[in-house]
Amino acid sequence: MPNVAETERSNDSGNGEHKSERKSPEENLQGAVKSFCTSASGAPLGPKGDGHYPWSCPVTHTREKIYAICSDYAFLNQATSIYKTPNPSRSPCLPDSTSLSAGNNSSRYIGIPTSTSEIIYNEENSLENLSNSLGKLPLAWEIDKSEFDGVTTNSKHKSGNAKKQVSKRKTSDKKGRYQKECPQHSPLEDIKQRKVLDLRRWYCISRPQYKTSCGISSLISCWNFLYSTMGAGNLPPITQEEALHILGFQPPFEDIRFGPFTGNTTLMRWFRQINDHFHVKGCSYVLYKPHGKNKTAGETASGALSKLTRGLKDESLAYIYHCQNHYFCPIGFEATPVKANKAFSRGPLSPQEVEYWILIGESSRKHPAIHCKKWADIVTDLNTQNPEYLDIRHLERGLQYRKTKKVGGNLHCIIAFQRLNWQRFGLWNFPFGTIRQESQPPTHAQGIAKSESEDNISKKQHGRLGRSFSASFHQDSAWKKMSSIHERRNSGYQGYSDYDGND
């Protein structure tokens, strides 16, 4: 790096004027100098032989900061020049032994070589510590680059913020595009599909029941859900007593033994009779009955489960489960994942990944209001055959055996009841052939002997039990075809009655 001071000293001795034609690098730097130390403005520089000061003084803090720009090739090691004013006053910042010798026409720039070793300046040190360690060393000024750093930092921040905003915008665009293409799927919807319980079904359970009246109590529970305002209909709800009165029974209802004449076909017939009374439409059928008379041939357990779970989500369907000596109403289900990490999994699970539990509303006050039974246990109950049976309400007893000589068959099943709309046309809407009308009014049913079953009840006695036929809907052959279950009590069961008087 050229010695600027020597060059300027030679020019001053020759003509006493500043260079006008040829500009040195220091003159180009003069416009960049914005402030200087007023305390060192005009003091004479004490000569040390050649007027040069070694670049060995550290950078110190002063009240006024002077700016200097270093050349590219010596930016980290040395400053190019320091602005010097022509004020001849002594600098109070310098030691007493140090003076600035300058003539009237002296140069404004003093070169500073880098011959001696540098003293590293730690910016964390205080000014007092620095003044003690400096001693008599010449003074140098701090090269303040804060404005330049601020500019670069701001530009970096601006560019960084712009990049972040662009990336955020791209991310949001991607998310928006993904949400448009694949709408957000909530796990709650999947849970709702796996855990189904319509509280209206539970509200409609007629509880408690009369002794052995579980059949009519379950039927009224289904009817109220399908047709009354307590469930999914628009009619006033009815009670067991009102239904029994419609069916032709007279009080005291506690004395009626419903067991001997209440069967699957009886419940379906009563359902139609109550519908005729209120001028509403509906149908009933056996959903799943793997064994016995009028079994659902070809229906599998998985197929029945699929229909049952779909039906429990449908407010136009209700169910009655006929188990050991009892009727009650399925009202919901839960598909429980087999693995714990699938508890809140999204999307449907395969049948192999879940096990189904059926929620069953109980009409008897002697049992819990809601049973929760495995579908596998229900299938076991429906698939047992006489003399073997399984009491679904007492699974702790395991498989049991009846005392009977007859082998095979099972009355247990699941019956479906469906509400039909007036706009729907089906077999129920059309009269076929000769219309049969009931000529005898229904009378009290208590005169029937306990030992009589549906096999032995004559048509005349059916009339006394409250059976009636709608003149606008049915003919004998059509009724037999639609009911599909002219199943009789104790048919194929010698010495076995499905009711023992327990509720």
UniProtKB/Swiss-Prot annotation:
Disordered, as annotated region: 1-33, 152-184, 438-469
Ranges of compositional bias, category Basic and acidic residues: 1-26, 173-184
Stated name of the protein: Basic immunoglobulin-like variable motif-containing protein
Subcellular location: Cytoplasm; Nucleus
Amino acid composition bias (Basic residues), ranges on this chain: 155-172
GO CC field: cytoplasm; extracellular space; nucleus
Tagged with keyword Lipoprotein: no
PANTHER family, sorted: BASIC IMMUNOGLOBULIN-LIKE VARIABLE MOTIF-CONTAINING PROTEIN, DNA REPAIR PROTEIN COMPLEMENTING XP-G CELLS-RELATED
Domain of life of the organism encoding this protein: Eukaryota
Keywords for this protein: Cytoplasm, Nucleus
UniProt key word Calcium: no
Family designation: Belongs to the BIVM family.
Tissues expressing this chain: Widely expressed. Expressed at higher level in spleen, ovary, small intestine, colon, peripheral blood leukocytes and liver. Also expressed in testis, ovary, aorta, appendix, trachea, pituitary gland, bladder, uterus, spinal cord, salivary gland, stomach, mammary gland and bone marrow. Weakly or not expressed in fetal spleen, adult thymus and certain cancer cell lines.
GO MF annotation: an example: single-stranded DNA binding
Gene that encodes the chain: BIVM
